[in-house]
Amino acid sequence: MKEIIFALPPSTENTAELYDYYKKSNCKIKIYDYPSFKTAGKKRQLREFEIEDLLFRKPIEISDEKTLGYYANKVVLITGGGGSIGSELCRQLAKMSPKQIIILDIYENGVYDVQQELKFKYGNKLDLEVEIASITDKDAMSVVFEKYHPDIVINAAAHKHVPLMEHNCVEAIKNNVFGTENVLELCEEYGVDRFMMVSTDKAVNPTNVMGATKRMCEMIAQSYATRGKVKCSCTRFGNVLGSAGSVIPLFKRQIAAGGPVTLTDKRIIRYFMTIPEASQLVLQSGAIAKNGEIFVLDMGQPIKIYDLAKNMIKLSAAQNIEIIETGLRPGEKLYEELLVRTDELDTTENDLIFVEKEKPISYDEVE
């Protein structure tokens, strides 16, 4: 026996249990996607066991009318729109019949890729504009706001690499904190209805520069919410599978090179979600937001990075690849804190989305 094919309904428990059993067999594991209402009538093929399958839970999908209707006929500006999350936000929004999408990023290659992808898929049915600018350049951003007068601004522009930001803290503050404040000031000036910020679990009790800057961004956004001119909300989520600079591409490169696979500590655990899940969470939380909320997602059980590395090596069918510990980096946590404690959270109409109860500080205090 050389291959094992999973042709099962998407049941978290069963899939995880069977995977644990069969991964010891040295057989290649493939998946035949089980027919569902959405895939009925479509051609299905055998596929490789992908990284997303290692979450062993159903993908989170948004199909509620409230979210879909909220973005219809709106002009939406996405900063950092060429990045992993930003580009997926563009893909998701394109399905929601917006009046116009403006993709803004300083990284032109990422913007170009998503622009071409959406043009090919939607053609003239989608009003799509691209602007190359940095959120740290307020004058350039002002030109963009004057040109488009967006209804909704989603701020996904940020420096996110923890080790790099430890050594480049001035740039982290300049881009993440002051850049976010630039965007918020312009939102007020140009009468934007809603500002939504992409945040991170590293903003909870931060131990590194990147997390501290994102916590500052949350506080700034909440302080602007108290002024009543722009509705503001923030959305926290954990590590995103396959995003640029994440551990998954690193492990893939190391496995392809024959090893070793390096991780800082075998005890590290992280919450994970897919890029589409993270993007949909941002969009749904924005649609249900009132003003000043920090949203967090129940992402299920955290995953050991060591187990993830072992599973990736197993899926690659590579032999004799060693896993080496390199030691925790400055500011790195063994355990990320996302939901903190359930008694600190309020529920929402979505069972997977919660709101932190912490009261925002005033604009004067932030200043």
Predicted features and spans:
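A solvent-exposed beta-alpha-beta segment
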Residues: M1-F37, N109-D113, K121, L128-E129, ...
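N-terminal Rossmann NAD(P)H-binding glycine-rich loop of SDR-like oxidoreductase domains
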Residues: V76-M96
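Flexible, Lys/Arg-rich cytosolic regulatory linkers and terminal tails that connect or flank
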Residues: T15-V75, E188
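Conserved Rossmann-fold NAD(P)-dependent oxidoreductase catalytic core, especially the SDR/UDP-sugar
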Residues: K23-K28, Y32, T39-G41, N155, ...
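Conserved glycine-rich Rossmann-like NAD(P)H-binding loop of the short-chain dehydrogenase/reductase
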Residues: P98-D113
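Proline-aspartate-enriched helix->loop->beta-strand connector
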Residues: M1-I4, P98-K99, F145-I154, V162, ...
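Conserved Rossmann-fold cofactor-binding substructure of NAD(P)-dependent oxidoreductases
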Residues: E129-I152, G331
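Strand-loop microenvironment adjacent to phosphate/nucleotide-handling motifs in alpha/beta enzyme folds
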Residues: K2, N26, K66-L68, M219, ...
